[in-house]
Regions:
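Non-catalytic DNA-binding core/recognition domains of DNA-processing enzymes
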Residues: 1-4, 19, 102
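Basic, Lys/Arg- and aromatic-enriched nucleic-acid-binding interface segment
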Residues: 7, 11-66, 168
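C-terminal catalytic core of Y-nucleophile DNA break-rejoin enzymes
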Residues: 25, 92-111, 119-140
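Conserved tyrosine-mediated DNA breakage-rejoining catalytic core shared by Y-recombinases
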Residues: 29-31, 35, 71-111
Length: 223
Protein backbone atom coordinates (compact mmCIF):
# COMPACT_ATOMS: atom_id res chain seq x y z
CA UNK A 1 0.00 0.00 0.00
CA UNK A 2 2.83 2.42 0.88
CA UNK A 3 4.67 1.58 -2.36
CA UNK A 4 1.45 2.17 -4.26
CA UNK A 5 1.07 5.60 -2.62
CA UNK A 6 4.64 6.54 -3.62
CA UNK A 7 4.02 5.35 -7.19
CA UNK A 8 0.94 7.57 -7.47
CA UNK A 9 2.92 10.41 -5.84
CA UNK A 10 0.45 10.72 -2.97
CA UNK A 11 3.57 10.78 -0.83
CA UNK A 12 7.14 11.47 -1.91
CA UNK A 13 9.01 8.96 0.26
CA UNK A 14 7.96 5.86 2.14
CA UNK A 15 8.09 6.48 5.91
CA UNK A 16 9.42 2.93 6.24
CA UNK A 17 12.26 3.28 3.70
CA UNK A 18 15.01 2.95 6.31
CA UNK A 19 13.17 0.52 8.54
CA UNK A 20 14.61 -2.98 8.78
CA UNK A 21 12.99 -5.92 10.49
CA UNK A 22 15.08 -8.08 12.76
CA UNK A 23 14.16 -11.60 13.73
CA UNK A 24 15.27 -13.54 16.75
CA UNK A 25 15.27 -17.32 16.69
CA UNK A 26 13.03 -18.68 19.41
CA UNK A 27 14.37 -21.62 21.40
CA UNK A 28 12.31 -24.71 20.62
CA UNK A 29 12.59 -27.33 23.34
CA UNK A 30 11.90 -30.91 22.34
CA UNK A 31 12.26 -34.34 23.90
CA UNK A 32 14.98 -36.64 22.64
CA UNK A 33 14.17 -40.31 22.09
CA UNK A 34 15.35 -41.39 25.55
CA UNK A 35 13.18 -38.76 27.24
CA UNK A 36 10.23 -39.67 25.05
CA UNK A 37 10.58 -43.35 25.94
CA UNK A 38 10.98 -42.53 29.62
CA UNK A 39 7.74 -40.55 29.65
CA UNK A 40 5.86 -43.16 27.62
CA UNK A 41 6.88 -46.04 29.89
CA UNK A 42 6.55 -44.21 33.22
CA UNK A 43 3.95 -45.76 35.54
CA UNK A 44 1.64 -42.99 36.70
CA UNK A 45 -0.93 -43.94 39.31
CA UNK A 46 -2.77 -40.60 39.28
CA UNK A 47 -5.42 -40.76 36.56
CA UNK A 48 -5.28 -37.09 35.51
CA UNK A 49 -1.50 -37.30 35.02
CA UNK A 50 -1.71 -40.57 33.11
CA UNK A 51 -4.29 -39.07 30.75
CA UNK A 52 -2.28 -35.91 30.12
CA UNK A 53 0.88 -37.97 29.58
CA UNK A 54 -0.93 -40.10 27.00
CA UNK A 55 -2.37 -37.07 25.21
CA UNK A 56 1.07 -35.48 25.13
CA UNK A 57 2.67 -38.64 23.75
CA UNK A 58 -0.07 -38.72 21.10
CA UNK A 59 0.89 -35.19 20.04
CA UNK A 60 4.58 -36.18 19.99
CA UNK A 61 3.74 -38.84 17.40
CA UNK A 62 1.27 -36.81 15.32
CA UNK A 63 2.52 -33.23 15.60
CA UNK A 64 -0.85 -31.84 16.61
CA UNK A 65 -0.95 -28.56 18.50
CA UNK A 66 -3.19 -28.53 21.58
CA UNK A 67 -6.12 -26.83 19.84
CA UNK A 68 -6.07 -29.41 17.02
CA UNK A 69 -5.62 -32.48 19.24
CA UNK A 70 -8.38 -31.36 21.62
CA UNK A 71 -10.86 -31.03 18.73
CA UNK A 72 -10.22 -34.47 17.21
CA UNK A 73 -13.19 -36.83 17.03
CA UNK A 74 -13.52 -40.49 16.00
CA UNK A 75 -15.02 -39.21 12.73
CA UNK A 76 -11.60 -37.81 11.79
CA UNK A 77 -10.05 -41.29 11.66
CA UNK A 78 -10.31 -42.91 8.24
CA UNK A 79 -8.57 -45.48 6.08
CA UNK A 80 -5.73 -43.86 4.14
CA UNK A 81 -4.21 -44.58 0.76
CA UNK A 82 -2.08 -47.39 2.22
CA UNK A 83 -5.00 -49.20 3.84
CA UNK A 84 -3.99 -48.09 7.34
CA UNK A 85 -5.69 -45.61 9.64
CA UNK A 86 -5.03 -41.92 9.13
CA UNK A 87 -6.43 -38.71 10.57
CA UNK A 88 -8.01 -36.66 7.79
CA UNK A 89 -9.32 -33.22 8.75
CA UNK A 90 -8.81 -29.45 8.49
CA UNK A 91 -6.04 -27.96 10.59
CA UNK A 92 -7.34 -25.15 12.82
CA UNK A 93 -4.53 -22.66 12.17
CA UNK A 94 -4.30 -22.91 8.38
CA UNK A 95 -7.69 -24.45 7.50
CA UNK A 96 -5.83 -26.78 5.14
CA UNK A 97 -6.91 -30.40 4.75
CA UNK A 98 -4.24 -32.62 6.26
CA UNK A 99 -3.64 -36.34 6.12
CA UNK A 100 -1.67 -37.73 9.05
CA UNK A 101 -0.85 -41.47 9.11
CA UNK A 102 -1.25 -42.86 12.62
CA UNK A 103 1.92 -44.42 13.99
CA UNK A 104 1.47 -47.49 16.26
CA UNK A 105 1.87 -45.61 19.56
CA UNK A 106 -0.67 -42.96 18.53
CA UNK A 107 -3.11 -45.68 17.47
CA UNK A 108 -2.57 -47.50 20.76
CA UNK A 109 -3.53 -44.36 22.70
CA UNK A 110 -6.67 -43.84 20.60
CA UNK A 111 -7.75 -47.41 21.31
CA UNK A 112 -7.08 -46.95 25.01
CA UNK A 113 -9.54 -44.07 25.31
CA UNK A 114 -12.25 -44.98 22.80
CA UNK A 115 -14.64 -45.94 25.62
CA UNK A 116 -13.58 -43.19 28.04
CA UNK A 117 -16.69 -41.41 29.46
CA UNK A 118 -15.46 -37.94 28.44
CA UNK A 119 -14.62 -39.08 24.92
CA UNK A 120 -17.96 -40.82 24.43
CA UNK A 121 -20.10 -37.98 25.79
CA UNK A 122 -18.20 -35.25 23.88
CA UNK A 123 -17.41 -37.21 20.70
CA UNK A 124 -13.69 -36.70 21.23
CA UNK A 125 -10.70 -38.88 20.46
CA UNK A 126 -8.81 -37.94 23.64
CA UNK A 127 -9.73 -36.82 27.20
CA UNK A 128 -7.91 -33.49 27.08
CA UNK A 129 -8.10 -30.91 29.89
CA UNK A 130 -8.07 -27.14 29.62
CA UNK A 131 -4.86 -25.69 28.22
CA UNK A 132 -3.89 -23.98 31.49
CA UNK A 133 -4.30 -27.11 33.60
CA UNK A 134 -2.71 -29.23 30.89
CA UNK A 135 0.60 -27.37 31.05
CA UNK A 136 0.57 -27.54 34.84
CA UNK A 137 0.13 -31.29 34.73
CA UNK A 138 2.94 -31.59 32.18
CA UNK A 139 5.27 -29.93 34.68
CA UNK A 140 4.32 -32.53 37.30
CA UNK A 141 4.92 -35.32 34.81
CA UNK A 142 8.33 -33.93 33.84
CA UNK A 143 9.34 -33.86 37.51
CA UNK A 144 8.19 -37.45 38.04
CA UNK A 145 10.10 -38.59 34.93
CA UNK A 146 13.26 -36.70 35.86
CA UNK A 147 13.03 -34.55 32.73
CA UNK A 148 14.65 -31.15 33.26
CA UNK A 149 13.15 -29.44 30.22
CA UNK A 150 10.09 -27.22 30.48
CA UNK A 151 7.24 -29.17 28.91
CA UNK A 152 4.37 -27.27 27.29
CA UNK A 153 1.76 -28.04 24.66
CA UNK A 154 4.26 -26.76 22.05
CA UNK A 155 7.05 -29.12 23.14
CA UNK A 156 5.20 -32.13 21.75
CA UNK A 157 4.91 -30.59 18.29
CA UNK A 158 8.61 -29.69 18.30
CA UNK A 159 9.38 -33.28 19.37
CA UNK A 160 7.40 -34.64 16.43
CA UNK A 161 9.26 -32.38 14.00
CA UNK A 162 12.74 -33.16 15.30
CA UNK A 163 12.97 -36.49 17.15
CA UNK A 164 10.21 -38.39 15.35
CA UNK A 165 10.61 -37.02 11.81
CA UNK A 166 13.90 -35.34 10.91
CA UNK A 167 16.16 -37.41 13.18
CA UNK A 168 14.65 -40.50 11.54
CA UNK A 169 15.58 -39.18 8.08
CA UNK A 170 12.08 -38.19 6.99
CA UNK A 171 12.58 -35.77 4.04
CA UNK A 172 12.05 -32.08 4.72
CA UNK A 173 9.21 -31.89 2.17
CA UNK A 174 7.34 -34.74 3.87
CA UNK A 175 7.88 -33.16 7.28
CA UNK A 176 6.47 -29.92 5.91
CA UNK A 177 3.27 -31.67 4.83
CA UNK A 178 2.86 -33.56 8.10
CA UNK A 179 3.39 -30.40 10.15
CA UNK A 180 0.90 -28.44 8.07
CA UNK A 181 3.42 -25.75 7.15
CA UNK A 182 2.67 -23.58 4.13
CA UNK A 183 6.29 -22.44 3.76
CA UNK A 184 9.20 -24.88 3.83
CA UNK A 185 11.37 -22.23 5.49
CA UNK A 186 9.34 -22.77 8.65
CA UNK A 187 10.16 -26.48 8.54
CA UNK A 188 13.83 -25.74 7.85
CA UNK A 189 14.08 -24.11 11.28
CA UNK A 190 13.73 -27.61 12.72
CA UNK A 191 16.39 -28.82 10.30
CA UNK A 192 18.85 -26.34 11.81
CA UNK A 193 17.94 -27.55 15.30
CA UNK A 194 18.65 -31.13 14.23
CA UNK A 195 22.02 -30.13 12.75
CA UNK A 196 22.95 -28.40 16.00
CA UNK A 197 22.00 -31.50 18.00
CA UNK A 198 24.04 -33.75 15.71
CA UNK A 199 26.99 -31.37 16.12
CA UNK A 200 26.68 -31.43 19.92
CA UNK A 201 26.36 -35.22 19.97
CA UNK A 202 29.46 -35.61 17.81
CA UNK A 203 31.38 -33.22 20.06
CA UNK A 204 30.47 -35.33 23.08
CA UNK A 205 31.52 -38.47 21.19
CA UNK A 206 34.81 -36.83 20.24
CA UNK A 207 35.50 -35.88 23.87
CA UNK A 208 34.65 -39.42 24.96
CA UNK A 209 36.97 -41.00 22.39
CA UNK A 210 39.78 -38.62 23.34
CA UNK A 211 39.28 -39.65 26.96
CA UNK A 212 39.46 -43.34 26.05
CA UNK A 213 42.60 -42.72 23.98
CA UNK A 214 44.28 -40.84 26.82
CA UNK A 215 43.53 -43.68 29.24
CA UNK A 216 44.96 -46.20 26.77
CA UNK A 217 48.13 -44.13 26.34
CA UNK A 218 48.44 -43.73 30.10
CA UNK A 219 48.11 -47.48 30.65
CA UNK A 220 50.69 -48.11 27.93
CA UNK A 221 53.19 -45.83 29.67
CA UNK A 222 52.63 -47.60 32.98
CA UNK A 223 53.19 -50.98 31.40
Amino acid sequence: MIKYAVTLEYIMVSPFANFKCSYKNVKRDFLDQDELNKMYKKELHIERLAEVRDCNIFSCYTGYAYVDAEALSPDDVAIGIDGNKWIIRDRYKTDNVENIPLLPIAMEIIEKYKNHPYCKSNNRLLPMNSNQRYNGYLKEIADLCGIKKKLTTHTARHTFATTVLLLNDVPMETAMELLGHTDIRTTQIYGKIVQKKVSNDMRKLKDKLIGVQEIAVSNGVKN
